[in-house]
Curated annotation (Swiss-Prot):
Listed pathway(s): Amino-acid biosynthesis; L-histidine biosynthesis; L-histidine from 5-phospho-alpha-D-ribose 1-diphosphate: step 9/9
Protein name (database record): Histidinol dehydrogenase
Residues given in the record as NAD(+) binding sites: Y130, Q191, N214
Cofactor binding, note field: Binds 1 zinc ion per subunit.
Protein backbone atom coordinates (compact mmCIF):
# COMPACT_ATOMS: atom_id res chain seq x y z
CA UNK A 1 0.00 0.00 0.00
CA UNK A 2 1.39 3.40 -1.01
CA UNK A 3 1.75 6.16 1.55
CA UNK A 4 -1.24 8.49 1.87
CA UNK A 5 -0.78 12.20 2.67
CA UNK A 6 -3.46 14.86 3.17
CA UNK A 7 -2.56 18.52 2.72
CA UNK A 8 -5.06 19.53 5.40
CA UNK A 9 -3.56 17.31 8.10
CA UNK A 10 -1.66 19.22 10.77
CA UNK A 11 1.30 16.89 10.29
CA UNK A 12 1.39 17.28 6.51
CA UNK A 13 4.43 19.55 6.25
CA UNK A 14 6.49 17.32 8.50
CA UNK A 15 5.31 14.17 6.73
CA UNK A 16 5.86 15.65 3.26
CA UNK A 17 9.37 16.83 4.15
CA UNK A 18 10.21 13.34 5.41
CA UNK A 19 8.76 11.85 2.22
CA UNK A 20 10.99 14.07 0.08
CA UNK A 21 14.11 12.79 1.80
CA UNK A 22 13.24 9.09 1.57
CA UNK A 23 16.27 7.19 0.30
CA UNK A 24 15.40 4.96 -2.66
CA UNK A 25 18.79 3.43 -3.40
CA UNK A 26 20.93 1.05 -1.43
CA UNK A 27 24.37 2.61 -1.24
CA UNK A 28 27.14 0.23 -2.17
CA UNK A 29 30.64 1.25 -1.19
CA UNK A 30 32.28 0.17 -4.41
CA UNK A 31 34.74 3.03 -4.79
CA UNK A 32 37.81 1.03 -3.79
CA UNK A 33 36.95 -1.83 -6.13
CA UNK A 34 36.24 0.59 -8.97
CA UNK A 35 39.48 2.48 -8.39
CA UNK A 36 41.43 -0.78 -8.63
CA UNK A 37 39.67 -1.69 -11.89
CA UNK A 38 40.36 1.73 -13.39
CA UNK A 39 44.02 1.57 -12.41
CA UNK A 40 44.30 -1.93 -13.86
CA UNK A 41 42.80 -0.89 -17.20
CA UNK A 42 45.12 2.12 -17.35
CA UNK A 43 48.10 -0.14 -16.69
CA UNK A 44 47.26 -3.22 -18.77
CA UNK A 45 44.82 -1.93 -21.38
CA UNK A 46 43.23 -4.59 -23.57
CA UNK A 47 44.58 -7.42 -21.43
CA UNK A 48 42.69 -6.10 -18.41
CA UNK A 49 39.50 -5.74 -20.46
CA UNK A 50 39.84 -9.32 -21.63
CA UNK A 51 40.30 -10.60 -18.09
CA UNK A 52 37.31 -8.71 -16.67
CA UNK A 53 35.07 -9.66 -19.59
CA UNK A 54 35.96 -13.33 -19.15
CA UNK A 55 35.33 -13.14 -15.40
CA UNK A 56 32.09 -11.13 -15.38
CA UNK A 57 30.49 -11.86 -18.76
CA UNK A 58 31.95 -15.21 -19.79
CA UNK A 59 33.44 -13.75 -22.98
CA UNK A 60 36.58 -15.00 -24.72
CA UNK A 61 37.78 -12.20 -26.98
CA UNK A 62 39.93 -14.65 -28.92
CA UNK A 63 36.63 -16.15 -30.09
CA UNK A 64 34.24 -13.19 -30.25
CA UNK A 65 36.58 -10.26 -30.65
CA UNK A 66 36.18 -7.10 -28.59
CA UNK A 67 34.72 -4.99 -31.38
CA UNK A 68 31.31 -5.68 -32.89
CA UNK A 69 31.65 -6.06 -36.65
CA UNK A 70 29.52 -4.40 -39.29
CA UNK A 71 28.38 -7.86 -40.37
CA UNK A 72 27.10 -8.54 -36.85
CA UNK A 73 25.10 -5.33 -36.93
CA UNK A 74 23.67 -6.29 -40.33
CA UNK A 75 22.65 -9.68 -38.95
CA UNK A 76 21.11 -8.08 -35.87
CA UNK A 77 18.90 -5.85 -38.00
CA UNK A 78 17.55 -8.90 -39.83
CA UNK A 79 16.93 -10.62 -36.49
CA UNK A 80 14.74 -7.82 -35.13
CA UNK A 81 10.99 -8.27 -35.57
CA UNK A 82 9.73 -6.02 -38.41
CA UNK A 83 7.26 -4.19 -36.16
CA UNK A 84 10.02 -3.43 -33.65
CA UNK A 85 12.41 -2.24 -36.35
CA UNK A 86 9.65 -0.07 -37.80
CA UNK A 87 8.94 1.41 -34.37
CA UNK A 88 12.62 2.16 -33.85
CA UNK A 89 12.67 3.98 -37.19
CA UNK A 90 9.63 6.05 -36.18
CA UNK A 91 11.30 6.92 -32.88
CA UNK A 92 14.63 7.75 -34.52
CA UNK A 93 13.02 10.07 -37.07
CA UNK A 94 11.09 11.97 -34.42
CA UNK A 95 13.97 12.19 -31.93
CA UNK A 96 16.36 13.49 -34.58
CA UNK A 97 13.87 16.05 -35.90
CA UNK A 98 13.10 17.41 -32.44
CA UNK A 99 16.73 17.65 -31.42
CA UNK A 100 17.67 19.52 -34.60
CA UNK A 101 15.58 22.38 -33.21
CA UNK A 102 17.94 22.52 -30.21
CA UNK A 103 21.03 23.33 -32.29
CA UNK A 104 22.52 26.59 -31.00
CA UNK A 105 23.70 29.26 -33.40
CA UNK A 106 26.92 31.23 -33.32
CA UNK A 107 26.39 34.84 -32.25
CA UNK A 108 29.13 37.24 -33.36
CA UNK A 109 28.49 40.97 -33.12
CA UNK A 110 30.13 44.37 -32.64
CA UNK A 111 29.04 46.61 -29.79
CA UNK A 112 28.70 50.42 -29.84
CA UNK A 113 32.35 50.82 -28.91
CA UNK A 114 33.42 48.73 -31.88
CA UNK A 115 34.48 45.75 -29.77
CA UNK A 116 33.82 42.41 -31.41
CA UNK A 117 32.17 39.86 -29.13
CA UNK A 118 30.37 36.60 -29.53
CA UNK A 119 29.95 32.93 -28.90
CA UNK A 120 30.97 30.06 -31.14
CA UNK A 121 29.65 26.51 -30.75
CA UNK A 122 31.64 23.39 -31.62
CA UNK A 123 30.83 19.71 -31.12
CA UNK A 124 32.76 17.53 -28.69
CA UNK A 125 35.41 15.51 -30.53
CA UNK A 126 34.40 12.05 -29.27
CA UNK A 127 31.65 10.69 -27.03
CA UNK A 128 31.34 7.30 -25.36
CA UNK A 129 27.87 5.83 -24.87
CA UNK A 130 27.46 3.26 -22.11
CA UNK A 131 24.51 0.92 -22.72
CA UNK A 132 23.54 -1.41 -19.86
CA UNK A 133 23.17 -5.10 -20.59
CA UNK A 134 20.74 -7.67 -19.26
CA UNK A 135 17.17 -6.67 -18.39
CA UNK A 136 18.08 -2.97 -18.56
CA UNK A 137 19.26 -3.19 -22.18
CA UNK A 138 16.93 -0.73 -23.85
CA UNK A 139 17.32 0.10 -27.56
CA UNK A 140 15.28 3.27 -27.05
CA UNK A 141 18.03 4.58 -24.77
CA UNK A 142 20.58 4.08 -27.55
CA UNK A 143 18.54 6.41 -29.74
CA UNK A 144 18.03 8.95 -26.96
CA UNK A 145 21.74 9.14 -26.14
CA UNK A 146 23.25 8.83 -29.60
CA UNK A 147 20.97 10.88 -31.85
CA UNK A 148 21.51 14.23 -30.06
CA UNK A 149 25.26 13.62 -30.41
CA UNK A 150 24.81 12.91 -34.11
CA UNK A 151 22.72 16.07 -34.54
CA UNK A 152 25.35 18.08 -32.66
CA UNK A 153 27.96 16.94 -35.18
CA UNK A 154 30.08 14.79 -32.87
CA UNK A 155 32.46 13.10 -35.34
CA UNK A 156 33.08 9.96 -33.26
CA UNK A 157 30.45 8.17 -31.18
CA UNK A 158 31.58 4.99 -29.44
CA UNK A 159 29.21 2.51 -27.80
CA UNK A 160 30.11 -0.02 -25.12
CA UNK A 161 27.68 -2.70 -23.99
CA UNK A 162 28.23 -5.72 -21.75
CA UNK A 163 27.55 -8.94 -23.62
CA UNK A 164 26.85 -12.01 -21.53
CA UNK A 165 28.45 -14.90 -23.40
CA UNK A 166 29.34 -12.49 -26.19
CA UNK A 167 25.78 -11.83 -27.40
CA UNK A 168 24.09 -8.43 -27.53
CA UNK A 169 20.39 -7.67 -27.83
CA UNK A 170 19.86 -7.37 -31.64
CA UNK A 171 17.50 -4.40 -31.15
CA UNK A 172 20.30 -2.52 -29.38
CA UNK A 173 22.58 -3.02 -32.38
CA UNK A 174 19.79 -2.06 -34.76
CA UNK A 175 19.21 1.15 -32.81
CA UNK A 176 22.93 1.89 -32.97
CA UNK A 177 22.88 1.55 -36.76
CA UNK A 178 19.85 3.84 -37.02
CA UNK A 179 21.68 6.42 -34.88
CA UNK A 180 24.82 6.19 -36.99
CA UNK A 181 26.95 4.41 -34.38
CA UNK A 182 29.30 1.85 -35.91
CA UNK A 183 32.14 1.71 -33.35
CA UNK A 184 30.83 -0.73 -30.74
CA UNK A 185 32.66 -2.83 -28.15
CA UNK A 186 31.27 -5.74 -26.15
CA UNK A 187 32.56 -4.57 -22.78
CA UNK A 188 30.77 -3.27 -19.71
CA UNK A 189 31.18 -2.28 -16.09
CA UNK A 190 33.76 0.04 -14.58
CA UNK A 191 36.35 -1.39 -16.96
CA UNK A 192 34.41 -0.06 -19.97
CA UNK A 193 34.22 3.40 -18.42
CA UNK A 194 37.96 3.30 -17.76
CA UNK A 195 38.67 2.26 -21.35
CA UNK A 196 36.58 5.13 -22.70
CA UNK A 197 38.23 7.65 -20.40
CA UNK A 198 41.87 6.61 -20.74
CA UNK A 199 41.99 4.46 -23.85
CA UNK A 200 43.60 1.10 -24.54
CA UNK A 201 45.49 -0.41 -27.47
CA UNK A 202 42.16 -0.95 -29.25
CA UNK A 203 39.93 1.83 -27.92
CA UNK A 204 40.88 5.47 -28.36
CA UNK A 205 39.81 7.68 -25.44
CA UNK A 206 36.75 9.93 -25.68
CA UNK A 207 36.05 13.38 -24.26
CA UNK A 208 32.69 12.65 -22.63
CA UNK A 209 30.84 9.58 -21.34
CA UNK A 210 27.04 9.33 -21.25
CA UNK A 211 24.55 6.63 -20.38
CA UNK A 212 23.23 4.86 -17.28
CA UNK A 213 24.62 1.86 -15.45
CA UNK A 214 24.82 0.04 -12.14
CA UNK A 215 26.61 1.17 -8.97
CA UNK A 216 30.01 0.24 -10.41
CA UNK A 217 29.41 2.20 -13.61
CA UNK A 218 28.14 5.21 -11.65
CA UNK A 219 31.17 5.13 -9.36
CA UNK A 220 33.50 4.84 -12.34
CA UNK A 221 31.89 7.83 -14.02
CA UNK A 222 32.37 9.86 -10.86
CA UNK A 223 36.02 8.86 -10.63
CA UNK A 224 36.93 9.65 -14.24
CA UNK A 225 35.05 12.97 -14.21
CA UNK A 226 37.58 15.70 -14.84
CA UNK A 227 39.56 13.54 -17.21
CA UNK A 228 36.37 13.35 -19.26
CA UNK A 229 32.97 14.95 -18.98
CA UNK A 230 29.92 12.96 -17.92
CA UNK A 231 26.22 13.50 -18.42
CA UNK A 232 24.68 12.74 -15.01
CA UNK A 233 24.48 10.09 -12.32
CA UNK A 234 21.00 8.70 -12.87
CA UNK A 235 18.93 7.31 -10.02
CA UNK A 236 15.74 5.22 -10.07
CA UNK A 237 12.97 6.45 -12.36
CA UNK A 238 10.06 8.52 -11.06
CA UNK A 239 6.74 10.01 -12.13
CA UNK A 240 4.37 12.52 -10.56
CA UNK A 241 0.81 12.59 -11.91
CA UNK A 242 -1.48 15.50 -11.06
CA UNK A 243 -4.98 14.28 -11.92
CA UNK A 244 -8.59 15.26 -11.28
CA UNK A 245 -11.59 12.98 -10.87
CA UNK A 246 -12.60 13.25 -14.53
CA UNK A 247 -9.82 10.82 -15.46
CA UNK A 248 -10.31 7.09 -15.87
CA UNK A 249 -8.66 5.60 -12.74
CA UNK A 250 -7.32 2.74 -14.85
CA UNK A 251 -5.45 5.18 -17.10
CA UNK A 252 -3.74 6.87 -14.17
CA UNK A 253 -2.98 3.55 -12.48
CA UNK A 254 -1.35 2.33 -15.69
CA UNK A 255 0.82 5.45 -15.81
CA UNK A 256 1.95 4.95 -12.22
CA UNK A 257 2.79 1.30 -12.83
CA UNK A 258 4.70 2.17 -16.01
CA UNK A 259 7.30 3.77 -13.74
CA UNK A 260 7.01 1.27 -10.90
CA UNK A 261 7.89 -1.68 -13.14
CA UNK A 262 11.29 -0.17 -13.96
CA UNK A 263 12.88 -0.83 -10.61
CA UNK A 264 11.96 -1.63 -7.02
CA UNK A 265 13.46 1.76 -6.18
CA UNK A 266 11.33 3.64 -8.73
CA UNK A 267 8.72 6.07 -7.47
CA UNK A 268 5.17 6.83 -8.63
CA UNK A 269 3.18 9.66 -7.02
CA UNK A 270 -0.40 10.83 -7.55
CA UNK A 271 -1.62 14.25 -6.47
CA UNK A 272 -5.39 14.68 -6.67
CA UNK A 273 -8.08 16.93 -5.23
CA UNK A 274 -10.59 14.08 -4.89
CA UNK A 275 -10.21 11.43 -2.18
CA UNK A 276 -12.63 9.01 -3.86
CA UNK A 277 -10.64 9.24 -7.09
CA UNK A 278 -7.44 8.53 -5.17
CA UNK A 279 -9.09 5.43 -3.70
CA UNK A 280 -10.20 4.31 -7.16
CA UNK A 281 -6.68 4.69 -8.55
CA UNK A 282 -5.20 2.65 -5.70
CA UNK A 283 -7.71 -0.12 -6.35
CA UNK A 284 -6.90 0.00 -10.07
CA UNK A 285 -3.19 -0.32 -9.27
CA UNK A 286 -3.81 -3.43 -7.17
CA UNK A 287 -6.01 -4.90 -9.90
CA UNK A 288 -3.51 -4.26 -12.70
CA UNK A 289 -0.61 -5.61 -10.66
CA UNK A 290 -2.21 -9.06 -10.83
CA UNK A 291 -1.58 -9.29 -14.56
CA UNK A 292 1.77 -7.51 -14.91
CA UNK A 293 4.77 -9.66 -15.93
CA UNK A 294 6.99 -7.50 -13.70
CA UNK A 295 4.45 -7.45 -10.87
CA UNK A 296 6.95 -8.22 -8.12
CA UNK A 297 9.15 -5.26 -9.02
CA UNK A 298 6.22 -2.89 -9.56
CA UNK A 299 4.50 -3.96 -6.35
CA UNK A 300 7.65 -3.37 -4.31
CA UNK A 301 8.08 0.09 -5.82
CA UNK A 302 4.45 1.06 -5.17
CA UNK A 303 4.48 -0.37 -1.65
CA UNK A 304 7.76 1.17 -0.54
CA UNK A 305 7.89 4.48 -2.41
CA UNK A 306 4.50 5.17 -4.00
CA UNK A 307 2.27 7.96 -2.70
CA UNK A 308 -1.20 9.42 -3.05
CA UNK A 309 -1.34 13.06 -1.95
CA UNK A 310 -4.71 14.73 -1.41
CA UNK A 311 -4.90 18.52 -1.87
CA UNK A 312 -7.90 20.82 -1.35
CA UNK A 313 -7.34 22.38 -4.80
CA UNK A 314 -4.76 22.29 -7.56
CA UNK A 315 -3.32 25.67 -6.58
CA UNK A 316 -1.67 23.70 -3.77
CA UNK A 317 -0.46 20.98 -6.14
CA UNK A 318 1.97 23.07 -8.18
CA UNK A 319 4.17 24.20 -5.25
CA UNK A 320 4.33 20.57 -4.11
CA UNK A 321 5.33 19.50 -7.61
CA UNK A 322 8.11 22.08 -7.66
CA UNK A 323 9.43 20.75 -4.36
CA UNK A 324 9.30 17.16 -5.58
CA UNK A 325 11.05 18.21 -8.83
CA UNK A 326 10.06 14.97 -10.58
CA UNK A 327 11.80 13.35 -13.49
CA UNK A 328 8.43 13.04 -15.26
CA UNK A 329 5.37 15.21 -14.54
CA UNK A 330 1.96 14.39 -16.01
CA UNK A 331 -0.77 17.04 -15.90
CA UNK A 332 -4.10 15.25 -16.34
CA UNK A 333 -6.53 17.99 -15.37
CA UNK A 334 -9.30 19.98 -17.03
CA UNK A 335 -6.94 22.87 -17.79
CA UNK A 336 -3.36 21.58 -17.72
CA UNK A 337 -2.01 24.51 -19.75
CA UNK A 338 -2.89 26.85 -16.90
CA UNK A 339 -0.48 24.96 -14.66
CA UNK A 340 2.49 24.83 -17.00
CA UNK A 341 3.82 28.40 -16.49
CA UNK A 342 4.10 27.82 -12.74
CA UNK A 343 6.02 24.55 -13.07
CA UNK A 344 9.68 25.38 -12.46
CA UNK A 345 11.20 22.04 -11.54
CA UNK A 346 10.52 19.00 -13.72
CA UNK A 347 12.62 16.94 -16.09
CA UNK A 348 9.76 16.74 -18.60
CA UNK A 349 6.10 17.79 -18.56
CA UNK A 350 3.38 15.72 -20.24
CA UNK A 351 0.34 17.86 -20.88
CA UNK A 352 -3.20 16.48 -20.96
CA UNK A 353 -4.92 13.15 -20.43
CA UNK A 354 -3.83 11.78 -23.79
CA UNK A 355 -0.11 12.31 -23.19
CA UNK A 356 1.09 9.36 -21.13
CA UNK A 357 4.71 9.61 -20.10
CA UNK A 358 5.44 6.39 -22.00
CA UNK A 359 5.06 8.25 -25.31
CA UNK A 360 7.99 10.37 -24.19
CA UNK A 361 9.93 7.22 -23.38
CA UNK A 362 9.77 6.07 -26.97
CA UNK A 363 8.25 8.01 -29.85
CA UNK A 364 7.30 11.52 -28.74
CA UNK A 365 10.60 12.98 -29.93
CA UNK A 366 11.67 14.58 -26.65
CA UNK A 367 14.50 12.94 -24.74
CA UNK A 368 13.86 10.38 -22.01
CA UNK A 369 17.25 10.84 -20.33
CA UNK A 370 16.12 13.11 -17.52
CA UNK A 371 17.28 14.31 -14.09
CA UNK A 372 16.16 12.15 -11.16
CA UNK A 373 16.22 12.37 -7.35
CA UNK A 374 15.07 16.02 -7.32
CA UNK A 375 18.00 17.11 -9.49
CA UNK A 376 15.51 18.76 -11.87
CA UNK A 377 15.82 21.68 -9.43
CA UNK A 378 19.19 22.49 -11.01
CA UNK A 379 19.69 20.39 -14.14
CA UNK A 380 18.08 19.47 -17.45
CA UNK A 381 17.45 16.41 -19.53
CA UNK A 382 19.92 15.23 -22.14
CA UNK A 383 19.98 17.19 -25.37
CA UNK A 384 22.14 18.65 -28.11
CA UNK A 385 23.71 21.16 -25.71
CA UNK A 386 25.30 18.26 -23.83
CA UNK A 387 27.39 17.48 -26.90
CA UNK A 388 28.63 20.94 -27.83
CA UNK A 389 30.94 23.51 -26.26
CA UNK A 390 30.64 27.29 -26.29
CA UNK A 391 33.77 29.36 -26.96
CA UNK A 392 33.76 33.10 -26.25
CA UNK A 393 35.05 35.47 -28.95
CA UNK A 394 36.62 38.88 -28.30
CA UNK A 395 38.30 41.31 -30.75
CA UNK A 396 39.70 44.79 -30.12
CA UNK A 397 41.49 47.25 -32.36
CA UNK A 398 43.85 50.01 -31.19
CA UNK A 399 41.02 52.48 -30.64
CA UNK A 400 39.04 50.05 -28.49
CA UNK A 401 42.14 49.14 -26.47
CA UNK A 402 42.83 52.81 -25.76
CA UNK A 403 39.30 53.21 -24.41
CA UNK A 404 39.09 50.02 -22.33
CA UNK A 405 42.75 49.57 -21.41
CA UNK A 406 43.01 52.02 -18.48
CA UNK A 407 40.11 50.33 -16.67
CA UNK A 408 41.72 46.92 -17.15
CA UNK A 409 45.02 48.25 -15.79
CA UNK A 410 43.32 49.73 -12.73
CA UNK A 411 41.49 46.49 -11.94
CA UNK A 412 44.61 44.36 -12.45
CA UNK A 413 46.65 46.49 -10.05
CA UNK A 414 43.83 46.52 -7.50
CA UNK A 415 44.11 42.74 -7.49
CA UNK A 416 47.89 42.81 -7.14
CA UNK A 417 48.53 41.40 -10.62
CA UNK A 418 51.16 43.73 -12.08
CA UNK A 419 52.01 41.49 -15.04
CA UNK A 420 48.36 41.68 -16.04
CA UNK A 421 48.50 45.47 -15.93
CA UNK A 422 51.72 45.63 -17.94
CA UNK A 423 50.26 43.36 -20.64
CA UNK A 424 47.85 46.18 -21.45
CA UNK A 425 50.06 49.14 -20.58
CA UNK A 426 52.86 48.03 -22.92
CA UNK A 427 50.44 48.20 -25.84
CA UNK A 428 49.42 51.71 -24.85
CA UNK A 429 53.05 52.86 -24.41
CA UNK A 430 52.27 53.74 -20.80
CA UNK A 431 55.37 52.15 -19.29
CA UNK A 432 55.53 50.30 -16.01
CA UNK A 433 53.87 53.11 -14.07
CA UNK A 434 51.23 53.91 -16.69
Amino acid sequence: MAIRLNYLDTSFERDFAAFLTTKREVSEDVNAVVRAIIDDVRARGDAALADYSARFDGIDFTVTGMAVTSAEIDAAIHAVAPEVLGALKVAATRIEAHHRRQLPKDDIYEDQMGVGLGSRWTPIDAVGLYVPGGTASYPSSVLMNALPAKVAGVPRIVMVVPASGGSINPAVLAAARLAGVEEIYRIGGAQAVAALAYGTETIEPVAKIVGPGNAYVAAAKRQVFGTVGIDMIAGPSEVLVIADRDNDPDWIAADLLAQAEHDAGAQAILITDDAAFGDAVEKAVERQLKTLPRAETAAASWRDFGAVILVPDFDKAVPLANRIAPEHLELATADPDAMVPAIRNAGAIFIGRHTPEVIGDYVGGSNHVLPTARSARFSSGLGVLDYVKRTSILRLGPDQLRILGPAAIALARSEGLEAHARSVAIRLNLGEEG
